UniProtKB/Swiss-Prot annotation:
Biased segments, Basic and acidic residues type: 632-642
GO CC annotations on file: 3M complex; centrosome; Cul7-RING ubiquitin ligase complex; cytoplasm; Golgi apparatus; perinuclear region of cytoplasm
Keywords: Cytoplasm, Cytoskeleton, Golgi apparatus, Isopeptide bond, Phosphoprotein, Ubl conjugation, Ubl conjugation pathway
Domain CPH: 392-465
Function: Core component of the 3M and Cul7-RING(FBXW8) complexes, which mediate the ubiquitination and subsequent proteasomal degradation of target proteins. Core component of the 3M complex, a complex required to regulate microtubule dynamics and genome integrity. It is unclear how the 3M complex regulates microtubules, it could act by controlling the level of a microtubule stabilizer. The Cul7-RING(FBXW8) complex alone lacks ubiquitination activity and does not promote polyubiquitination and proteasomal degradation of p53/TP53.
Matching Gene3D superfamilies: 2.30.30.30, Cullin Repeats, Cullin, Chain C, Domain 2, Galactose-binding domain-like, Winged helix-like DNA-binding domain superfamily/Winged helix DNA-binding domain
Residue positions where Phosphoserine is found in the record: 371
Domain of life: Eukaryota
Record text on subunit structure and interactions: Component of the 3M complex, composed of core components CUL7, CCDC8 and OBSL1. Component of the Cul7-RING(FBXW8) complex consisting of CUL7, RBX1, SKP1 and FBXW8. Within the Cul7-RING(FBXW8) complex interacts with FBXW8 and RBX1, but not with SKP1. Interacts with CUL1 (via the C-terminal domain); the interaction seems to be mediated by FBXW8; it is likely specific to FBXW8, but not other F-box proteins.
Name the record gives this protein: Cullin-7
Cross-link (Glycyl lysine isopeptide (Lys-Gly) (interchain with G-Cter in NEDD8)): 1607
Length: 1729
């Protein structure tokens, strides 16, 4: 039958392709908080199971989870389950109408018939005791079964006599009676809730939980008999029921139980070898299980009705519930104890366990301490490694890692040895030299030996080159400076975590422990101790109670008081020392493994001197108990090794000598069985001792599994065992635990025939007495073993045929037993998960004894995995078997190559018993060409002759290296064959590089992990949605999210610390909890609503707006900020591991949102998605804040300081909320960038100009010195951090333009160049064209030229002096050599020569005129500025030194021109064939005026020097003389005529512009300042002015060119590099750019690729251009765009002419010596510098 899948739209993802759907309401109760809770059944379906139609049909046996939910959780997750009145809709009651279908009178008649039939059947049963049941009895029972199937008659069967009737029928020796009882029970159970819809009539029916699905309780035999489970419970709890049930009756009840639990917990334990459990033990487990479930039902039903707890006094009700909880805990502990013993987990306790849990958060991944191949003794914290290379632990197999090492390793790299190999030890380091195709293939120079040695690829760990290697300790603490370019400095070298004082593991400080509670056991510890006290027999139990009474003031202890007793720790320690001597062997093993014993037992008392004697006795008992198992196994081995002739003792005596003192029981038993007369009185006490301590008995049976030479021992043992079977008490011994030894002896081909015959006799006798052991033998494969023994001995084994037939008849029972142990184990797991859920919901501790033991056994093996060589027994190949080992040598260089015809290429794997392949991979190489496989088929079978099942077929790509053949097999195949059907390029032979086989984890951990994670994920996803609903309705509830999350996560942390045994289990729980709870919550609180605001974004906005109240204790601010910080610290607790594809946030409506989407949570549930959502929300908040600030304050004069302060607040808040994490610093940067990108172009240009001006002011002000200078530098640093946001944005181009102008002004003035360099080093990425860097570089080039010019001047001076000396010498020589008579003639000749020299020197007079200047020679520095990077405005006219400079300055400039023209190569200057200098008015000078030093510009210097010769000069004449514009001249005159200046401007009507005169110092006092700065401030056009509009016009021109070019190329588009080239070419050729625009830009027609790329980014952002998905580097035109065309009338299209001069130069004039001072009263100006 199938049922309709309702509420299919409310699905919760539980894993890949796995979803949970709410199905129906099961029951309700009052929760711990007084509010009603509802148990909802959630169906678990895989993808495709829910059907394709609108309403899927699902099987009622589908997996499900029962989850208690509050009304708010139901509303948030499946609101359709609420009716119109707001109440939860219960299960449908469609069958209630059937009651009215029967007439009342007819119904009464039928009820009378049923009562009479019950009475008649009881009477007939009593009459036929011991005889064959008559036919009327069978007919009566048949009619009763028919009546039982009618639901309206269910009430009649409340009669307690029905239970007596069923009991007698099930106890009847007749099969037909027992069969009829089963039919009647099935008829009664057909009325289970939902059976009519989902059950299958006459078959197994519903699950065990239908008892829990009802509102009734089961208190005794007289309760309602409504379901099969209730009947089983009532029957199984009858005293001495096992005495009344034979094998068939017990199997009938077990079959009913198996049918009842068929769909309760359909867990698959396939691949896990479950032990053989006899029916007697199974029936006991069923009784325990039914008792536990009934108590659990009573606990749930005790609060089913809201008014239930008001029917009696609160204290009485609480006491009743507390007693019920105690009974449930004791029953659950007993069930766990028996289940652990039945599955023999306790016998595996001495096996190596996985490493204990390391302390730490379960929500953060644990880092491996050492490499897998490195022994622990050699692990050193100073090992070095490189962060760039992957360790071996990250790879699934050795072959994969070997391929990675082979492809990555380069000669010269450092490597470390991971394994011991011949002469090289693990941990040795060396340098990789070379590799080849040999074996081993890798040559390494090892430091330990000083020479090279060859090893294998998989043995090496790559460290990298020497410069890449870092210390491991530092690497663990270091976190890379990812955001260094954001802040201009590296992050701290420590890894940030929440402060230990505030956030202890896991997150918050644990609750304060009560000092009084610390002195007593917790309730869970006391109940665990009470469990063992209740296990004691009568006298021992009373003695322990007497001890408790004496230490607790003699209080009378009843069950109610015992449940709530506060036991001091000292008393508990005394009890733990007393109990071991009073418990039996089974209970003692439980005591040793329990939590309270480990915490307060002898190990805890080892340091207490008050217990020395008790500890000694305790240790003796424990050592004896723990050593019995090992001694029993070793005893048989000792017997096998010692020859019989060496000892006169019998074989049995030698066996017990190896066992110890407890072996005396076996000797006494042998003696008692060998004696004549009555043996029962002697044997029975010994059997009771063996029941209490079964280890000697197990050792006796295990001795059969010894070598065949121990024939005498085997015969003796079999004789004893055969005699023991006849005693009823012996059947209570654990025969099933040692039947394996019998099977080993039966299967051994060397077993002696007499021994084999005795073994057959013994097994036949054992199975005849108890058919349970025939079932156990069937499970162990005894039928085949007996058949082989009969074949060997030609059928001459007595009773062997009968034994084989008996074993064969138990095939159905063996299947039933396997099903039962699976169902019981699955049911226990479900109850454990239910207790964990209640623990989560109620926050009450788990008080069940052995709860941690059960979880430890379920989680054991979590770190164990079947390795390759453990999966298969041998590997066979079709040909070349001597090379088969190359398939598994983990060396990718070697291979197996076939040798034969096509179709005969195969590899055969003989798998180990029970191994299910998790992954089978074939390694190939594309370099093998035609030898590489092309098609591979995998077949499976039971033998090599039956490989008929094709498991998979794979087509291999030519480029493949790893071919996965099989994955996650669900069936065991003894033989698996890999057939290479075809090779690449039609090749015949094939080459296989390797074979990888991964097996499953053969433990219960994968099953339990799946169930634990499913329940955890469903619970927390439901809770996350409910919390998200609250926060959507009221954003203020977001402030409580931190406390909610802290409570949930701390509870999971405490649970893992208390109950989970290892890191893998704890990490699985933590990861699931985090993904199910935190990830959805973060997704919901970061998703914007219809107004575009997310709850977390609103909270962060509030945090920023109220920053001023952070430290005001009088306000409510500190508490608010603390909650916000705790929330954000918690949400970023887990670091991102991987980056899945981004999820686009979709707006969601406000208020109570009834529709939600869980569909994407399967991929969003990762830590990295949390970080992505948080950073996205943080970016939106920052963008909103910055955008509001820019909109309101962009015109303000103090815009930049306020912006920097605002940015600093955002930066500090990011550190406060999220710590120095690069992701959130990047979100801050992106948020600011997003706000800047929204600015219109003119506003953006104005903002960039403001930033450039502010930086200029801070740099200029840093010259002040002192504290103000430090303050200025701090403000400058803060501004630079904010400016870094411009990097990569379109605004960077405009910012570079303005910064270039301000920087040029500073560099031409008195500013430190080192500060300029430091600023450029920090904000260099903000200059796409790198023009400021080039300007700074040109300064250094000019300094080098100045140094060379200085040397050049000295050379010229030396040459002039040398000429003068030669001239004087010639004159002197001419006078001395001539006679007096020729004196006049020779004087004329000498004079003529001198005249010639003077004539020749006239050409150089202009250059050398300052050589004979008598005053102080000024120092002149020349800056050669490249027009390529220096901005020179059009108002900066050229300077004519001949007319505007005095002679002593003019000569220096002329000499520099000659020097520059003569120079052949100058680095970093503009390349070109012609280099000419053109002097400009740019620059500055120092003049001496009286006692003042004036800092003036070059124009001002010329004007002041010009006044040295004139008393007054008109402005009009100055304009005519200099050729300057009126604006530039007036700008220079302004400071000179100010109050600090030396000139006065007199306005005259007849003289335009006025007359300049030197200010008379006698009329007004002259300033006493030593240095007066008169350089006029540089004024630039505002962004709103002509320059900003010109920049916008240029951008629009480029946009037009880009759009037109892409339109011409259509949809095919252009590569971005080609597009840039075409745009630059069009810009140069014209008709763009118009000359008017060019001249107004002031930089000529220069247009760089950076300008074009900036425009391309702008158009991409606007959607005008688009990228191709498959080729992102190709751009094409997308949609029409409105581009501002340049106005022709404002651009002067008709203007023409040559480009401006190529290079501009400026002068700096400095002087040497004492300044020249005029002696006259009139002050004059002298050039000082």
């Amino acid at each position: 039958m199938v049922g309709e899948l309702r509420y299919r739209e409310f699905r919760v993802p539980l894993g890949p392709g796995l979803h949970a759907y709410p199905d129906e309401l099961i029951r309700q109760r009052v929760g711990h908080d007084g509010h009603p809770e509802y148990q909802i059944r959630w169906l678990i379906l895989r993808r495709g199971d829910e059907g394709d139609g609108g309403s899927g049909q699902v099987d009622c046996k589908a997996e499900h989870i029962l989850l208690w939910m509050s009304k708010d959780e139901i509303y948030a997750n499946c609101h359709k389950m609420l009716g119109e009145d707001g109440q939860v809709i219960g299960p449908s009651q469609e069958s209630t109408g059937e009651v009215g279908a029967l007439d009342k009178s007819v119904l009464e008649e039928m009820e009378t018939d049923v009562k009479s039939l019950i009475q008649r059947a009881l009477r007939q049963l009593e009459e036929c005791v011991g005889t064959i049941p008559p036919a009327p009895l069978l007919h009566t029972v048949h009619v009763l079964s028919a009546y039982a199937s009618i639901e309206p008659l269910t009430g009649v069967f409340k009669d307690p006599r029905v239970l007596d009737l069923l009991m007698h029928m099930l106890s009847s020796p007749d099969y037909q009676i027992r069969w009829s009882a089963g039919r009647m029970i099935q008829a009664l159970s057909s009325h289970d809730a939902g059976e009519g819809q989902c059950g299958e009539e006459g078959k197994a029916g519903e699950e065990l939980g239908r008892l829990r699905d009802s509102q009734d309780t089961v208190a005794g035999a007289s309760d309602l008999i409504r379901t099969r489970t209730q009947i089983l419970l009532s029957l199984s709890q009858q005293e001495a029921i096992e005495k009344h049930l034979d094998f068939d009756s017990r199997c009938a009840l077990l079959a009913l139980f198996a049918q009842a639990t068929l769909s309760e917990h359909p867990m698959s334990f396939e691949g896990i070898q479950l032990p053989q459990v006899p029916g007697r033990v199974l029936f006991s487990l069923v009784k325990r299980y039914l008792h536990v479930t009934s108590l659990l039902d009573q606990l749930n039903d005790s609060a089913a009705e809201p008014g239930a707890q008001n029917t009696s006094a609160p204290e009485e009700w609480s006491g009743e519930r507390g007693q019920l909880e105690l009974e449930f805990s004791m029953a659950m502990g007993t069930l766990i104890s028996e289940l652990v013993q039945a599955i023999r987990w306790d016998q595996a306790s001495d096996r190596p366990r996985s490493s204990a849990r390391s302390p730490g958060s379960i929500f953060q991944p644990q880092l491996a301490d050492v490499s897998p191949g490195l022994p622990a003794t050699q692990a050193q914290p100073s090992f070095r490694r490189s962060r760039h290379f992957r360790p071996r632990s990250e790879f699934a197999s050795g072959n994969t890692y070997a391929l990675y090492v082979r492809d990555t390793l380069q000669p010269g790299m450092r490597v470390r040895m991971l394994d011991e190999y011949e002469e090289i030890s693990a941990g040795d380091e060396g340098e990789f030299r070379q590799s080849n195709n040999g074996v081993p293939p890798v040559q390494v120079l090892w430091e330990s030996t000083g020479r090279t040695y060859w090893v294998h690829w998989h043995m090496l760990e790559i460290l990298g080159f020497e410069e890449d290697i870092e210390d491991m300790v530092e690497a663990d603490e270091y976190q890379g400076a990812v955001a260094s370019r954001v802040l201009g400095r590296a992050l701290p070298a420590w890894r940030w975590r929440p402060m230990t004082e505030l956030y202890a593991v896991p997150y918050v400080l644990p609750e304060d422990e009560d000092s009084e509670e610390c002195e007593h056991l917790t309730l869970a510890e006391w109940w665990e101790l009470l469990f063992f006290i209740k296990k004691l027999d009568g006298p021992d139990h009373q003695e322990v109670l007497q001890i408790l009474q004496e230490n607790l003031d003699g209080e009378i202890l009843d069950d109610e008081i015992l449940a709530e007793l506060a036991v001091p720790i000292e008393l508990a320690q005394d009890l733990l020392l007393t109990l071991p001597q009073r418990l039996n062997d089974s209970a003692l093993r439980d005591l040793i493994n329990c939590h309270v014993y480990k915490k307060y037992g002898p190990e805890a008392l080892a340091g207490n001197p008050a217990y020395p004697s008790l500890l000694e006795a305790q240790e003796d008992v424990l050592l004896e108990a723990q050593a019995q198992a090992k001694d029993s196994e070793d005893a048989a081995k000792v017997e096998a090794k010692e020859p019989p002739s060496q000892s006169p003792n019998t074989p049995l005596q030698r066996l017990v000598e190896g066992y110890g003192p407890a072996g005396k029981i076996l000797l006494d038993l042998e003696q008692a069985l060998s004696s004549e007369g009555t043996q029962e009185n002697k044997v029975k006490p010994l059997l009771l001792q063996l029941q209490r301590q079964p280890q000697p008995f197990l050792a006796l049976m295990q001795s059969l599994d010894t070598p065949e030479t121990n024939r005498t021992l085997h015969l003796t043992v079999l004789r004893i065992l055969k005699q023991l079977v006849d005693f009823p008490e012996a059947l209570l011994l654990p025969w099933h635990e040692a039947v394996d030894a019998c099977m080993a002896c039966l299967r051994s081909p060397n077993t002696d025939r007499e021994v084999l015959q005795e073994l057959i006799f013994f097994l036949h006798r054992l199975t005849s007495v108890s058919r349970d052991y025939a079932v156990v033998l069937n499970q162990l494969g005894a039928r085949d073993a007996i058949s082989k023994a009969l074949e060997k001995h030609l059928g001459k084994l007595e009773l062997a045929q009968e034994l084989r037939d008996m074993v064969f008849k138990c095939e159905k029972h063996a299947h039933l037993y396997r099903e039962l142990i699976t169902n019981i184990l699955g049911g226990c797991i479900q109850m454990v998960l239910g207790q964990i859920e209640d623990h989560r919901r109620t926050h009450r501790p788990i008080n069940i004894p052995f709860f941690d033991v059960f979880l430890r056994y379920l989680c054991q093996g979590s770190s164990v995995e079947v390795k390759e060589d453990k999966c298969w027994e041998k590997v066979e190949v079709s040909s070349n078997p001597h090379r088969a080992s190359k398939l598994t040598d983990r060396n990718p260089k070697t291979y197996w190559e076939s040798n034969g015809s096509a179709g005969s290429r195969y590899i055969t794997l003989h798998m180990r018993q029970g191994i299910l392949i998790r992954q089978l991979t074939l390694l190939v190489a594309s370099e093998d060409s035609s030898y590489m496989p092309a098609r591979v088929v995998v077949c499976g079978g039971d033998s090599t002759s039956s490989l008929h099942t094709e498991l998979n077929s794979v087509n291999v790509m030519p480029s493949a290296s790893r071919v996965i053949l099989l994955e996650n097999l669900t069936r065991f195949w003894p033989i698996i064959q890999i057939r290479i059907k075809r090779c690449q390029q039609g090749g015949i032979d094939t080459r296989i590089r390797g074979l990888e086989t991964l097996g499953p984890k053969p433990t219960f951990w994968p099953v339990f992990r799946e169930q634990l994670c499913r329940h955890t994920r469903l619970f927390y996803m439901v809770r996350a949605q409910a919390w998200s609903q609250d926060m959507a309705e009221d954003r203020r509830s977001l402030l409580h999210l931190s406390s909610r999350l802290n409570g949930a996560l701390r509870q999971e942390q405490n649970f893992a610390d208390r109950f989970l045994p290892d890191n893998e289990a704890a990490q699985a729980l933590g990861k699931t909890c985090w993904e199910a709870l935190v990830s959805p919550v973060v997704q919901n609180i970061t998703s914007p609503d219809e107004d575009g605001i997310s709850p977390l974004g609103w909270l962060l906005d509030q945090y920023l707006e109220c920053q001023e109240a952070v430290f005001n204790p009088q306000s409510r601010g500190p508490a608010f900020f603390s909650r916000v910080r705790r929330l954000t610290h918690l949400l970023v607790h887990v670091e991102p591991c991987e980056a899945p594809p981004p999820v686009v946030a979709t707006p969601r409506p406000k208020g109570r949102n009834r529709s939600h989407d869980w569909s994407s949570l399967a991929t969003r549930g990762l830590p990295s998605s949390i970080m992505r959502n948080l950073t996205r929300c943080r970016r939106a908040v920052v963008e909103k804040q910055v955008n509001n600030f820019l909109t309101s304050s962009w015109r303000d004069d103090d815009f930049v300081p306020r912006y920097c302060e605002h940015f600093n607040i955002l930066q500090n808040s990011s550190s406060e909320l999220f710590g120095p994490r690069a992701a959130f610093l990047l979100a801050l940067q992106n948020g600011c960038a997003g706000a800047l990108l929204k600015l219109p172009f003119l506003k953006a240009a104005h903002v960039s100009e403001q930033f450039a001006r502010h930086i200029d002011q801070q740099i200029q002000g840093s010259r002040i010195g002192g504290a103000q200078e430090m303050e200025r530098l701090a403000q400058l640093q803060q501004c630079l951090q904010a400016v870094l946001i411009f990097s990569g944005l379109e605004i960077a181009t405009t910012f570079e333009h303005y910064y270039q102008h301000y920087m040029a002004d500073r560099l031409l003035g008195v500013v430190s160049s080192w500060l300029e360099g430091a600023v450029l080093e920090q904000i260099g990425p903000c200059f796409p064209n790198r023009l400021p860097q080039q300007m700074l570089q040109s300064l250094s080039t000019s300094k080098e030229l100045q140094r060379q010019f200085h040397v050049y001047q000295l050379q010229q001076l030396d040459q002039e002096l040398l000429k003068l000396e030669d001239t004087e010498k010639k004159i002197q020589v001419g006078h001395g050599a001539s006679g007096k008579e020729h004196k006049s003639e020779k004087e004329e000749e000498a004079g003529a020569a001198a005249a010639v020299d003077v004539a020749e020197g006239e050409e150089e007079e202009e250059e050398n005129e300052d050589l004979y200047y008598e005053g102080a020679m000024p120092e002149v520095s020349v800056l050669v500025l490249s027009r390529h990077c220096w901005p020179v405005a059009s108002i900066c006219h050229t300077l004519n030194p001949r007319t505007c400079l005095p002679s002593y300055l003019r000569g220096t400039l002329n000499r520099y021109s000659n020097f520059y023209n003569k120079s052949q190569s100058h680095p970093a200057l503009e390349r070109g064939s012609q280099r000419r200098l053109q002097w400009t008015w740019l620059g500055w000078a120092e003049l001496q005026f009286g006692n003042q030093t004036l800092h003036v510009s070059t124009v001002q210097m010329w004007l002041l020097l010009y006044l040295n010769d004139l008393k007054a000069v008109s402005v009009e004449s100055l304009l005519a003389l200099s050729g300057l514009s009126a604006d530039m001249l007036n700008q220079a005159i302004g400071p000179l005529t100010s109050s600090r200046g030396p000139l006065d401007l007199h306005e005259q009507k007849d003289i335009p512009g006025g007359v300049l005169k030197i200010r008379d110092g006698s009329k007004e006092p002259r300033s006493r300042w030593d240095i007066v700065r008169l350089i006029p401030p540089q004024t630039y056009l505002q962004a709103e002015g002509e320059e900003g509009r010109n920049l916008e016009k240029r951008r629009n021109l480029l946009n037009c060119l880009i759009v037109r070019i892409l339109k011409a190329h259509g949809d095919e588009g252009l590569h971005i590099d080609q597009l840039v080239c075409l745009v630059l070419e069009a810009w140069q050729k014209g008709p763009c750019p118009p000359r008017g625009l060019v001249s107004s830009l002031g930089k000529g027609s220069a247009c760089s690729s950076t300008d074009v790329l900036s425009c391309i980014l702008h158009l991409l952002g606007k959607g005008t251009l688009r990228r191709h998905d498959d080729r992102p580097q190709v751009l094409s035109y997308a949609v029409p765009v409105t581009v501002m065309e340049p106005h022709t009338e404002s651009l002067n299209p008709g203007s023409s002419g040559p480009n401006p001069p190529l290079t501009f130069h400026t002068v700096q004039i400095r002087s040497r010596g004492v300044p020249y001072a005029s002696c006259t009263a009139t002050q004059s100006f002298s050039t000082f510098r």
